[in-house]
Every structure is written in structure tokens, then in C-alpha cells.
């Protein structure tokens, strides 16, 4: 393992620890269960899952470090020049599904990828981001989420937040339904336009920003009263989350195609979901406002 890879791995393990500790403290009753695993083809990871807490219905914060002699199709499809190279992939990926429909689901991921071939220069890049999926939108929360994202990006250039915000909006889009998964945030891949140290610093800034982006929203909404109907709507909207993860998500596809651990890969799926045939929200309802106002292409910071 190279010095670069060792530094990234140390950071990711520490990030996993810090996020788990913060989430446990916010929940107040549940604790993460750790499941260490190994991958027969090379590598392994630490899966951490929290379930049936006071605030968190189900969540996972996973670390993985896998390696192999050939890239899986999902990784080499848009980089065909890397076919036949050995690879190492390290990352922390998390999804939090709260009980309360007034608390959004959150997702974050930071990862490092390096592909090597004897006699040739190593090719490396970082990827990641974080995004928010509300069920009952609150403008204050959306602005806060994007403000934290913007501040994390600011030291690396004025164009970084707008570019990766737009990429997030484009990526987390359910093409078969022509609707966004949530209100976005940041998404980026193939980050190597800076030198390694700057690129690594950027990834650390994004990883470290997640708790500051999410926990204030959780604190504001976790005690809000909700009805059975609102809970059912949350489960209905969770269906969109499942559809995206199983059809489009690069991380899910990479994990399954590279022989990753299925239980860890599918940890992101919510515990209870519903699909209703051709269900429509009542005009003028909070449920209708979610798609009409919040799940649209908005510049949250320009408007506030």
C-alpha cells in the first residue's frame, strides 16, 4: 500500500468513527453494530449499522477498502483506457433513514480510487459528495444544507460549489420518473484536477462538513409531531430512494460487480417502503408541495 493510500485510509477510518459517535449522541439510545468483513478477491471493510433508535430507524456508515487485478465494468465503462489495470478503492459511505417523516434522509460518500499497471504512471482520483432527501420540505433546512456545502467548497475556488451542485442535481435524478431524488447537495467524481495534496484536502473538507450540514436539521425536526398519513407518505417517497439505488447508483453497481459484500452494499435501503399504483398527492397539500416546490431545479443560496 502506497503512502498516499495509507493516508487516505487513516482519514476514512477516523471519519467513520467521528460520524458514528456524533449520530449515536444525537439519537440518544441506539448504538452502531460493527461487522468487520473480508473480500475473498482482496480487501474488506467495517460495516456499521444502527437500527430502531429514538431518532434513527435505520442507518449505516460503511468503510471499505477493496483491491483487485482488473477493474469491474462499472468503473471502466466511462474510462476504457483503464481496462486491465489493477485497482484499489477506498471509501466511506453512509445513509441515514430517520423515523420521523419531518427529518430528511441523508446520504454521504467520500472515496479514493487508484488504478495501476506495471511500467505506467498510476491513475488516481477522488469522488463523493452528500445529498438530502426530505419528505416534508422546509426552506430553512434546504438553505442550511447548501450553505454548509458552499462553505466547504469555497477554499478550492468560486466555481467548485456551483459545478458540483449542478452535477448532484443531474446525478440524483430518476430518469424513468423524470424527478429528482431530493434537494441535492454536492456530487463529484474523477477529482484530480489539483495535485494530490489539494485533492485530498478537498475530500477531507467535504467529509468533515457532513455532520455540520445534517445534525442541525435533525435537531430542529426530530421532535415534530406527525400523522399516520405522513408516515405513509414517507414510506411512499422512500420507494423512489430504492429505485434510484438499485437502478442508477454507481456505488451500488460497482460494489455488486466487483464482488463486494452484498449486505453492506444494500445497507442503504430503508427498512419500510411502499409503492401505491399511480398515487397522486392532493392538490395544494404539503405532499404536493414537495414535488412542486422543493424537488425542482433551485438555486437555494441565490434565493435566500
Curated annotation (Swiss-Prot):
Recorded catalytic activity of this chain's protein: coproporphyrinogen III + O2 + 2 H(+) = protoporphyrinogen IX + 2 CO2 + 2 H2O
Enzyme Commission no: 1.3.3.3
Entry annotated with the keyword Cytoplasm: yes
Spans annotated as Important for dimerization: 241-276
Annotated compartments: Cytoplasm
HAMAP family: Coprogen_oxidas (MF_00333)
Species: Pseudomonas syringae pv. syringae (strain B728a)
Subunit structure: Homodimer.
Protein name: Oxygen-dependent coproporphyrinogen-III oxidase
Stated family: Belongs to the aerobic coproporphyrinogen-III oxidase family.
Reported cofactor(s): a divalent metal cation
Site positions (Important for dimerization): 176
Enzyme type, top EC level: oxidoreductase
InterPro entries (UniProt xref): Coprogen_oxidase_aer (IPR001260), Coprogen_oxidase_aer_sf (IPR036406), Coprogen_oxidase_CS (IPR018375)
Superkingdom of origin: Bacteria
Key words, A-Z: Cytoplasm, Heme biosynthesis, Metal-binding, Oxidoreductase, Porphyrin biosynthesis
Gene name per UniProt: hemF
Amino acid at each position: 500500500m502506497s503512502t498516499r493510500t495509507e493516508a487516505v485510509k487513516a482519514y476514512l477510518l477516523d471519519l467513520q468513527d467521528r460520524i458514528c459517535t456524533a449520530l449515536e449522541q444525537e439519537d440518544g439510545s441506539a448504538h452502531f453494530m460493527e461487522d468487520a468483513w473480508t473480500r475473498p478477491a482482496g480487501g474488506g471493510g467495517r460495516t456499521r449499522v444502527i437500527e430502531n433508535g429514538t431518532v434513527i430507524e435505520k442507518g449505516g456508515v460503511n468503510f471499505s477498502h477493496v483491491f483487485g487485478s482488473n477493474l469491474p465494468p462499472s468503473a471502466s465503462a466511462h474510462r476504457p483506457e483503464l481496462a486491465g489495470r489493477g485497482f484499489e478503492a477506498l471509501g466511506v459511505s453512509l445513509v441515514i433513514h430517520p423515523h420521523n417523516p419531518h427529518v430528511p434522509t441523508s446520504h454521504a460518500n467520500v472515496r479514493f480510487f487508484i488504478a495501476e499497471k506495471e511500467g505506467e504512471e498510476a491513475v488516481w482520483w477522488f469522488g463523493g459528495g452528500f445529498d438530502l432527501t426530505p419528505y416534508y420540505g422546509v426552506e430553512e433546512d434546504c438553505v442550511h444544507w447548501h450553505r454548509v456545502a458552499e462553505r466547504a467548497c469555497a477554499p478550492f475556488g468560486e466555481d467548485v460549489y456551483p459545478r458540483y451542485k449542478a452535477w448532484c442535481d443531474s446525478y440524483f435524478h430518476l430518469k424513468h420518473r423524470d424527478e429528482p431524488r431530493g434537494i441535492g447537495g454536492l456530487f463529484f467524481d474523477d477529482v484530480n484536477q489539483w495535485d494530490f495534496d489539494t485533492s485530498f484536502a478537498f475530500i477531507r473538507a467535504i467529509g468533515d462538513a457532513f455532520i455540520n450540514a445534517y445534525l442541525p436539521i435533525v435537531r430542529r425536526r426530530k421532535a415534530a409531531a406527525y400523522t399516520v398519513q405522513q408516515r405513509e407518505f414517507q414510506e411512499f417517497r422512500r420507494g423512489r430512494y430504492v429505485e434510484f439505488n438499485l437502478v442508477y447508483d454507481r456505488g451500488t453497481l460497482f460494489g455488486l460487480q466487483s464482488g463486494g459484500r452484498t449486505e453492506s452494499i444494500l445497507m442503504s435501503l430503508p427498512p419500510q417502503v411502499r409503492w401505491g399504483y399511480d398515487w397522486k398527492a392532493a392538490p395544494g397539500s404539503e405532499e404536493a408541495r414537495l414535488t412542486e416546490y422543493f424537488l425542482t431545479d433551485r438555486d437555494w443560496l441565490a434565493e435566500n
